[in-house]
């Protein structure tokens, strides 16, 4: 097995490639050497405030509504430990390992920028856990996205203290046991360190990044499936003419139309009906793909830009400015930008699925597609894709409800001290469910379109789409007669979610990537 190359963490400068590496697989991470001075100066500033005894929020005071209560110096370590124990009140299923790895990475990156007042050992412990494959068990529910992701990040911090549970290679065990096996000492929190660890938007951002990377795969797979559907239905490629899109000027639409042209170029199926086709215009689900999918691309990229900024951000409170010896209370923990970005991704994911469902409906309707009813030989004896489409319709409808913006809601907490919140954590968390729904829809479309291509033989589709067809048929055989279909749909869903369908046409999809 090849050892993965080490990722050098440059706080404030992480790229999508960096984040995607950690999201995809365990990756060894080391901290850039130029962070040390800022970290040490920030920690020294906090210790100086403690030594002077002057009140500073989160350093020697209570928290939230209890901020006016000053804590004696000899109680400060106890204060930080109490903070973690009292705030670890999350519920629900644990975050998946890939999301939890992003949380650890982004928390280390934020603290290492030197505005949080923590010692180097705190950052080193986070990275040591990441490198040892120790994934804290972080419940996915319990955060309102301000003041930071308090409850889930408290569960992350529990593992650093040797409390709570963690997973190693998928096996859940006591965190203290996992740390000991890796030779990592549990930490004792100094002044402000507990607050710095739990104040921040890293959980919301990790969930939203998970949705972002899945949305990128969905967009690419649905574009391939949509192009296959055009050929399967003997649709026209004229709507993808660059002149149509240039006069509108929408960047995503222009890029997406070019992708469709590349995917369909050279199709013998298309050449077979260039002359004598009495259809003047295709239905919108075929003809308007660049307009819809291009808008989704623009939305995904806009959300991505926000999330990349947030992944590199300092979202702690209060912030420590070592150069001035000051501590300033602010509100960078408020995850409204993340909530908005996640809501935008939800719209894109829902719309990708909605358009795909409409193309399935077109393909199974012989009056629209010219293909056998429900895409099966001997219709009547066989039901073919009839109920597979019903499943797609059910999931498309479900996504429409899940796409309701989470950010429009707010409930005051902490005795009205925290009186407006973002709901960013739920905004990000529901994206995985929505992506799974859309992947199933697009997978069903891919099967339906491949079936349509098969019916046109000996006419062949384009070289690019032939590779997609081969990819589909490598997992799911031609549907000659009714059979148990659920395993085939699951296999197609995995082709979409794992990125294999998009990868089959990778050379044509560069303009649909985030970076």
Swiss-Prot record:
PROSITE patterns: PAL_HISTIDASE. GO terms for cellular component: cytoplasm. GO terms for molecular function: histidine ammonia-lyase activity. Contains an active site 4-methylidene-imidazol-5-one (MIO), which is formed autocatalytically by cyclization and dehydration of residues Ala-Ser-Gly. Pathway: Amino-acid degradation; L-histidine degradation into L-glutamate; N-formimidoyl-L-glutamate from L-histidine: step 1/3. There is a cross-link at residues 146-148 (5-imidazolinone (Ala-Gly)). Keywords: Cytoplasm, Histidine metabolism, Lyase. GO terms for biological process: L-histidine catabolic process to glutamate and formamide; L-histidine catabolic process to glutamate and formate. Pfam families: Lyase_aromatic (PF00221). It is an enzyme of class 4 (lyase). It catalyses: L-histidine = trans-urocanate + NH4(+). The modification 2,3-didehydroalanine (Ser) is found at residue 147. It is found in: Cytoplasm. Its EC number is 4.3.1.3. InterPro entries: Aromatic_Lyase, Fumarase/histidase_N, HutH, L-Aspartase-like, Phe/His_NH3-lyase_AS. Belongs to the PAL/histidase family. PANTHER family: HISTIDINE AMMONIA-LYASE. NCBIfam families: hutH, PRK09367.1. This is Histidine ammonia-lyase. It comes from Ralstonia nicotianae (strain ATCC BAA-1114 / GMI1000) (Ralstonia solanacearum).
